[in-house]
């Protein structure tokens, strides 16, 4: 008799077992030594509370609800919210977005699954720049696709030759995540423009458009006065996905959107397919309460200086210890090179010092490890001596 769980999902669970094992060990250390004695830099969970403007808007929505506020709503989202998002995007990109180009989703993860459901046939390929957000593998597999990795340089910037080599006649989409998880790098406009030219040529060569999916949940978490270039003006076949988990501190509320570039080939047809996907994947619609919230809190954001200060609090000491690390320009991650080639062994050595980080192998880049600085300053200060001890122990 075969097992009750589908073989494909069993395989996915096996591939994700390193995550489960890591968090099991973290829980054991906290239970044994006390949470206050463990430096947990493993989780990308936004630590900052929502801005006061968000809390005030929520109070208003809850205390003075409009009639019918909790009924079913359109699968694509509330029309007035979609129009608000479209106007915001038009202001940023100078492209003629309308409400019809917007599907409000259950976070960026929901938006990615909606997009891939609408795009992929069995056997199609999705290329992403490596290192990459670990869930991309599973999202592609959800819809019969296969994730293909295109390596980046030592600075984690786009390698156009590697990207071109990764594209085949089965390539349906390329996912770009900037600012990037796990590296924190921002891809500059000139690189993105060159990528667009490459994808236009590849689309012509293979006879169908390759869609560029811009995954941008960290767009508003950038440092040093930098900005994130808009991708849709650079490549017509772009889908923009994002969420308000990070900039508004609403990770648990699952509110984001998919924006279809107005000049996308068969844009109206794709929008209809995305709405259908949102429905039949079981999302149905994003939470109505938090949809209504968005236009009420335009311009609100968590204080990004908090994350920048923690980045700086880590960066200089780690380099002085001997760690090699590219300066993150956004998000809340560092992705140092492991002092030893085996990043998993390094992470285990760190656990012996009650220090929790994530092996780079899980992000497709062995020999590195990820630090999340979405923590308190006290956790950072407690972690630094442990980083130094581990570096000395492994012979870095």
Q: Where in this protein do the model-derived segments appear?
A:
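N-terminal small-domain helix-loop-helix segment of the aminotransferase-like
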Residues: 2-107, 114, 290, 297-304, ...
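PLP-dependent enzyme catalytic core of the Aspartate aminotransferase-like
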Residues: 87, 164, 299, 348, ...
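Conserved core of the PLP fold type I
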Residues: 67-207, 219-234, 239, 380
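Conserved glycine-rich beta-strand-loop-beta hairpin in the small C-terminal domain of fold type I
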Residues: 288-295, 307-319, 325-337, 367
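Short beta-strand
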Residues: 38-40, 241, 324-329, 361-362
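Conserved core segment of the aminotransferase class I/II
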Residues: 236-308, 312
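Alpha-helix termini
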Residues: 28-34, 92-94, 198-209, 262-268, ...
